[in-house]
């Protein structure tokens, strides 16, 4: 479930919006008090395409939120849990991933200042926009690896530090699960300059 993915991300230091899991209508008031309005009601179901199915809704006040929650709980999709999550004001998106270079047997950090894109298409049409940094597996991730990636993406100052922290968290996740690919597409940057993961699968 999405809420479990986000808990795992937070444990590795990856930033996610404030959220409260509710299992019934009686838990909504407490969640709204903690998260505030506007907020997003996200049905926790093990299927993709939740947005298109109408299972993710933005609500602006308690009255409309409760009516929406009731509709979601009573829907045909067998919704038993809702993640009540703060709504964020998005300014831009960036792309981050970590994978293994099978030829050199090194870990590759990949970043692009344009997120929400198909990275394979961008690699074919505009490869200069993609920044790649290789990390020796035995050596591990160093500060200069992270700096080379963020500077290469044109990120500096506080935002560069935040994205650098996300890269470190993603690297920890990648190594902890012995993964072949760890990807954030997109990492959202809010209008007040905060990096944030909004979506996880499912």
Regions found by a protein language model. Give the residues of each.
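Conserved small/polar residues in nucleotide/adenosyl-binding loops
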Residues: 199-202
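Conserved protein kinase catalytic/activation segment
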Residues: 194-195
């Amino acid at each position: 479930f999405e809420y479990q993915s986000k808990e795992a991300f937070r444990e590795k230091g990856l930033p996610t919006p404030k959220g409260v899991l509710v299992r019934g209508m009686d838990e909504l008031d407490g969640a709204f008090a903690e998260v505030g309005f506007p907020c997003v009601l996200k049905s926790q179901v093990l299927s993709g395409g939740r947005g298109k199915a109408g299972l993710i809704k933005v609500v602006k006040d308690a009255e409309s939120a409760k009516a929406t929650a009731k509709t979601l709980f009573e829907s045909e999709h067998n919704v038993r849990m809702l993640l009540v999550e703060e709504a964020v004001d998005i300014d831009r998106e960036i792309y981050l991933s970590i994978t293994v270079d099978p030829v050199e047997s090194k870990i590759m950090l990949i970043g692009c200042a344009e997120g929400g894109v198909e990275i394979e298409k961008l690699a074919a049409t505009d490869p200069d926009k993609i920044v790649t940094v290789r990390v020796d597996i035995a050596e591990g991730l160093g500060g200069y690896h992270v700096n080379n990636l963020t500077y290469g993406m044109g990120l500096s100052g506080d935002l560069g530090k935040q994205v650098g922290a996300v890269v470190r968290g993603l690297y920890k996740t990648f190594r902890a699960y012995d993964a072949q690919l760890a990807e954030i597409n997109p990492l959202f940057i809010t209008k007040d300059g905060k990096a944030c993961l909004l979506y996880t699968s499912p």
